[in-house]
Amino acid sequence: MKIKTRFAPSPTGYLHVGGARTALYSWLFARHHGGEFVLRIEDTDLERSTPEAIEAIMDGMNWLNLEWDEGPYFQTKRFDRYNAVIDEMLEAGTAYKCYCSKERLDQLREEQMAKGEKPRYDGRCRHSHEHHADDEPCVVRFANPQDGSVIFDDQIRGPIEFSNQELDDLIIRRTDGSPTYNFCVVVDDWDMEITHVIRGEDHINNTPRQINILKALNAPVPMYAHVSMINGDDGKKLSKRHGAVSVMQYRDDGYLPEALLNYLVRLGWSNGDQEIFTREEMINLFSLGAVSKSSSAFNTDKLLWLNHHYINTLAPEYVATHLQWHIEQENIDTRNGPQLAELVKLLGERCKTLKEMAQSCRYFYEDFSEFDADAAKKHLRPVARQPLEVVRDKLSAITDWSAENVHHAIQSTAEELEVGMGKVGMPLRVAVTGAGQSPALDVTVHAIGKTRSIERINKALGFIAERESQQ
């Protein structure tokens, strides 16, 4: 049997981390078994579905590199197929037309609730032989079995059973002729030959209804696996107040897709104590049997740790391709300065996100108009004038501009003046970067370049001279 899974988001908003994890698990399961992964857009909610949301879902899937083998299919383009199946069911007697008014259904619901009963349709039209005009408004309901039960072996939770007496004759076509969600899903899974449905636990109650419809159609029933919810670190359902929940927001905040995927796969699945997984390892090791039944807690600190790990372990050239977007957001012209791959090497240890890296690298490419006030007050004092003049002259004399030779110039200045390295290094750092923090000074000065470094030292000396004149 060829394994076939699907990810079927509704385009009523962005791709959130819960949906991304479901997509990842479905994708991994298909890839592990050499099967196929289908992308289906469940856009039957015409009022809430938007083109922007569809684009956001596609952007998220592409950024995570969860490539699909079929699709994207759109349910709104398959209405003719759904209605044809409904008409066949009406002919076969597995569905029926319901003419009950909204007022009657509301009254029925109120009466049932007053008696402490579960609100459900009473089947009046199922057994009715009244004649109705062809143009009289009606819905179509599925004739759910009235006895027995539905049992399915959830691939994560084990056997789950529902009594058919607890299930309603659900509406499968509205009065406006549009098919409903639960019915469209069934026909899609049938037509697309889906073998395994992996989705959130909030769909468990839909499963017996969908299984009954599949059986009424004499269609194969897929295996189902329901993944537990993701909570915030406070134990409550993950929401915006816990931080970013949109996949693309994590991109915007400077996370690498590898970090988010690695984090999401561990939110409910494990392989011993292993924390770091390459994409290939995820594919080789993933199984539904190792997915936890318990809900998971989202921990941003853990995600940040993973992101820092991947910034420093993935190829700098690859990380640079993602950094480029953040550099553009900061409007930094990188033509006059180090290559972005070199920047990743320079700042990787200090920066936990690419956004942080982009926001802290401007001095490598552009001159600054003023020094950081606190850093200048502390380090650009009259006592720093001589160390800066000496190190400037030594840097000017370098013919082979390298980090090693820059380091030698700084060290020999300290030795010549018989001062500690900090007495040279800190004023030099503020002079060339404008701030009090940077990567190692020799590689920083080397990356900034000889001409620009000397110009900035002269600017710092001018700042010191002006400071002296005001005393």
From Swiss-Prot:
GO terms for cellular component: cytosol. It is an enzyme of class 6 (ligase). Keywords: Aminoacyl-tRNA synthetase, ATP-binding, Cytoplasm, Ligase, Metal-binding, Nucleotide-binding, Protein biosynthesis, Zinc. Its cofactor is Zn(2+). The keyword Lyase does not apply. Monomer. This is Glutamate--tRNA ligase. It comes from Salmonella arizonae (strain ATCC BAA-731 / CDC346-86 / RSK2980).
